[in-house]
């Protein structure tokens, strides 16, 4: 618990890592407490860093464990392992339609056909190529409403494609955004009238997420891979 009082240290580690998110977790009883930091500060909900924590716990800290519960700023989050997939259960964001503005067009570099507000601004674009080829003006994106900018369109090989931009959190582009799909998945599941969708995040790194709804929750599944094991020296 003393570890989690060192918020300044966590922020500095996240800044030094300079990745979209750095996760900090500690075991408390049978559960884990989990917090996430970007180079620009703390977030209340993060997907792929949660999946990464579950991967480490299940494969290194508690080998053979197939279910992990996390206590977070967004309440209890769970991760269940099914083969090589890790299934996360997150709260869905309620989407409110908003007017498409010239400011959105100027910032994004394309005119949305629809726009919605949850925690983030969700902009639906004309087609997949527009999403993939987008070069937004991040100096203008930072002035749009919403914490992050989510852009999405119907996909050709998957149900939808998306990208996530987070200059307010000092993250130009998030490679794969789990919390973003708490906006994106509810939209496309309703739009396509499907029970489940396959979503592709079309960032330079890219990633596939399998999504379905469970009441007011989004159930997302994805894969994880070990990149490095390292020591951090705090002075």
Predicted segments with their positions:
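Active-site proximal loop and beta-alpha junction motif in alpha/beta enzyme cores
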Residues: 1-46, 51-235
């Amino acid at each position: 618990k003393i570890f989690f009082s060192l918020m300044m240290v966590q922020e500095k580690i996240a800044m030094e890592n300079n990745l979209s998110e750095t996760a900090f977790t500690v075991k408390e009883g049978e559960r884990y407490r989990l917090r996430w930091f970007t180079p620009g500060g703390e977030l209340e909900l993060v997907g792929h860093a949660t999946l990464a924590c579950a991967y480490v716990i299940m494969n290194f800290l508690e080998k053979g464990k197939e279910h992990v519960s996390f206590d977070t700023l967004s309440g209890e989050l769970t991760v269940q392992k099914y083969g090589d997939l890790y299934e996360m259960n997150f709260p869905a964001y309620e989407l409110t339609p908003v007017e498409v503005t010239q400011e959105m067009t100027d910032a994004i570099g394309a005119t949305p056909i629809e726009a919605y507000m949850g925690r983030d601004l969700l902009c639906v674009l004309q087609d997949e190529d527009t999403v993939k080829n987008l070069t937004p003006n991040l100096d203008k994106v930072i002035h749009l409403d919403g914490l992050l900018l989510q852009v999405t369109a119907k996909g050709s090989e998957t149900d939808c494609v998306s990208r996530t931009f987070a200059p307010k959190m000092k993250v130009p582009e998030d490679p794969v955004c789990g919390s973003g799909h708490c906006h994106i998945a509810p939209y496309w599941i309703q739009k396509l009238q499907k029970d489940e969708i396959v979503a592709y995040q079309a960032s330079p790194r890219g990633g596939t997420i399998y999504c379905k709804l469970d009441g007011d929750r989004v159930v997302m599944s994805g894969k994880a891979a070990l990149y490095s094991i390292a020591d951090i020296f705090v002075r």
